[in-house]
Amino acid sequence: MNYDSQQPPLPPLPYAGCRRASGFPALGRGGTVPVGVWGGAGQGREGRSWGEGPRGPGLGRRDLSSADPAVLGATMESRCYGCAVKFTLFKKEYGCKNCGRAFCSGCLSFSAAVPRTGNTQQKVCKQCHEVLTRGSSANASKWSPPQNYKKRVAALEAKQKPSTSQSQGLTRQDQMIAERLARLRQENKPKLVPSQAEIEARLAALKDERQGSIPSTQEMEARLAALQGRVLPSQTPQPAHHTPDTRTQAQQTQDLLTQLAAEVAIDESWKGGGPAASLQNDLNQGGPGSTNSKRQANWSLEEEKSRLLAEAALELREENTRQERILALAKRLAMLRGQDPERVTLQDYRLPDSDDDEDEETAIQRVLQQLTEEASLDEASGFNIPAEQASRPWTQPRGAEPEAQDVDPRPEAEEEELPWCCICNEDATLRCAGCDGDLFCARCFREGHDAFELKEHQTSAYSPPRAGQEH
């Protein structure tokens, strides 16, 4: 019974843009398309899902190229069997003389001798052209396994033939046991034992081999150090061993003094008789000796010159420093006298040269006299303090009334203040009313006030309170 004859006629394909049978548009499962391929390439009739047909499971969307040509031929009505192009007025239909399928002129471009037409050259499709030109022998050789595979299979069959004759009538398990037993026997066979002659020949060959010299330990260490990038052990400097000094400190001092005395004696002997003796010896020599003595004499002169210049520069710096100090002292003295310190020059206080001892003593006496005058001026000015008040501490009379406290009102907090100078933390001797009652020593008060403040600021003597008066 022909099953295909009972199928209804299939509608034509509406896809004119397809180039081949396997190039249909991708369709989702369960879709409905007018592709009437019985066997699964879409839906041929309504109510059938994708991949189903009257013949069971279909070919699937990707199996159109492997479908039966007879089935696909029914669906390719008025279309090219090779590129699925619809035949039109400009795309005419041609038939293959061998298989009879419809092709366009582009797909039917091969020529071959067709047996149906008396081996005459006819237009055929590509598949028929390959079949007709290669023949059956070519197809057989195309799908035939290689010769090496055939030889191995034949050798395996020949090897298994005797075992098959012995294992006839045995079950599968018995055959497996027999094969395992044969393998164990093959493994337990004694190996080939070499003869006495072979052993002697091998021993003689080993003795005849030329044995190289064994490297020494030093060579191996050197090679290892070279590979690791380290210093060779032979080139490593040995650590110097210093014996401990067992001398006492007094002995070390005495030895050091002896060494210094010996070095001084050598220097004195070289300075005393060395140059003269060398010059006398150079009189009997030619050129090289005289040149060496000249070089040595020149070097000594240069060294003496450098030393004298250094001493002169040092003396000049000391002289400048001394003059600056004298000028500063003169300006300070002029300020205390009430003169303009800018008009004071160093000519007024020029000291004689220090080469003369008597003049230097005179200069020292002059400086001392100036300092004495400065001290007397400080006492004369007194910073508005009487001399007897500066020498005698301030005490309150016993019979003083409480109203006397109004003259110099002091809060209770000031009684606990520290008796130190507010600048240098020395013992305070003055209290300046113009500086909010701050405590000063005589030196800081003089340096911290200018000429106007020294005249205007009122001061009073200050003595630190005793321990019994604090509380």
UniProtKB/Swiss-Prot annotation:
Transmembrane segments: none annotated. Residues 311-375 form a coiled coil. The modification Phosphothreonine is found at residue 243. Pfam families: ANCHR-like_BBOX, FYVE. SUPFAM superfamilies: B-box zinc-binding domain, FYVE/PHD zinc finger. Zn(2+) 1 binds at residues 80, 83, 104, 107. Phosphorylated in vitro at Ser-22 by AURKB; however, phosphorylation at this site could not be confirmed in vivo. It is found in: Cytoplasm, Cytoskeleton, Microtubule organizing center, Centrosome; Cleavage furrow; Midbody, Midbody ring. InterPro entries: Bbox1_ANCHR, Znf_FYVE, Znf_FYVE-rel, Znf_FYVE_PHD, Znf_RING/FYVE/PHD. Its main location: cytoplasm. A motif (MIM1-B) lies at residues 326-339. One of its GO terms (cellular component) is midbody. Detected in brain, heart, skeletal muscle and kidney. Expressed in the liver (at protein level). One of its GO terms (biological process) is mitotic cytokinesis checkpoint signaling. The keyword Cell division applies. A motif (MIM1-A) lies at residues 174-187. It comes from the Eukaryota. Residues 39-64, 271-299, 386-412 are annotated as: Disordered. The FYVE-type zinc finger mediates binding to phosphatidylinositol-3-phosphate (PtdIns(3)P). The MIM1-B motif mediates interaction with VPS4A. Interacts (via MIM1-B) with VPS4A; interaction takes place at the midbody ring following cytokinesis checkpoint activation. It is linked to A chromosomal aberration involving ZFYVE19 is associated with acute myeloblastic leukemia (AML). Translocation t(11;15)(q23;q14) with KMT2A/MLL1. Cholestasis, progressive familial intrahepatic, 9: An autosomal recessive form of progressive cholestasis, a disorder characterized by early onset of cholestasis that progresses to hepatic fibrosis, cirrhosis, and end-stage liver disease. PFIC9 onset is in infancy or early childhood. Key regulator of abscission step in cytokinesis: part of the cytokinesis checkpoint, a process required to delay abscission to prevent both premature resolution of intercellular chromosome bridges and accumulation of DNA damage. Together with CHMP4C, required to retain abscission-competent VPS4 (VPS4A and/or VPS4B) at the midbody ring until abscission checkpoint signaling is terminated at late cytokinesis. Deactivation of AURKB results in dephosphorylation of CHMP4C followed by its dissociation from ZFYVE19/ANCHR and VPS4 and subsequent abscission. This is Abscission/NoCut checkpoint regulator. It comes from Homo sapiens.
